[in-house]
Amino acid sequence: MKNMRVFYHYRLSVLLTLLTLGVATLGAKEIGNRYQGSAPALEGKIHVLTCFISETGWTAEEAEKSSAMIQEAEDWLVEQARNYGKEVTFVNATAGLDTPLLYDNIISGNGVGNEPVNLVSKLMPKLGYSNGLEYAKWISNNTDCDGCMVLIIANKPGRGYSMAYKNAFDDKLYYLEGTMLYTSYEEGMPNCAASIAHEMCHLFGAEDLYATFIQTEENEARARELFPDDIMLRVSYNIKTQKIDKLTAWLIGLTDEMEEWYLDFLYE
């Protein structure tokens, strides 16, 4: 691959308390878009490019900790998929460690929906691709992967968010789906694998189940009764206490079993 070292492997309160999720979601897939974008579903072989961006550079220890969190998130997703009879393999690549990807004033998400959603497309020229669509086509034509995504992570505090694709978006700019992650939350508590898995699920088509600027408090209350451990409702430092429940499983392609009332949780 161009300018990348590829490696393969099958890879907010106090510690061990349940966290109220501090993330925002931009462009979570609507029902008609469940199998759209570069990461159409949680199944098959999925290529994950992790881009380590920074204002000053990454230390080896920082990169190792973040890589371990990403692998823990991936391993959990593989296990959850198997609960629904699906086999998933993640194929990983990294950028930004051997040759730093430096930016001035990396901003945080804010939870109100006006975060920049073009970060993936802006990053691609630094890796030798004119845009995200060209990269996604390269993966499709040169690997046996069924989908791909980009995890952008900055070594600073921030509020993570996802950049999922919708049919109305410009393919060159937005078809390649990605997330913006940080090594710690805004309050300074370290990030965790569950938050990463949550954002990855958004790219596969999942919706937030907690109240946001587009999800209702009524739906959050209902989700707490129906799906109390779902990864899209809350996250925990102990990801083993979490699950992909049946609504999220349907949205991300793990099952075709669907109840009509699932639609009540979907937002535009």
Predicted feature descriptions by range:
Residues N3-V14:
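Bacterial N-terminal signal peptides that target proteins for export
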Residues K29-C145:
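Propeptide-to-catalytic entry region of secreted or membrane-anchored zinc metalloproteases
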Residues G178-I196:
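Short pre-active-site segment immediately N-terminal to the catalytic Zn-binding motif
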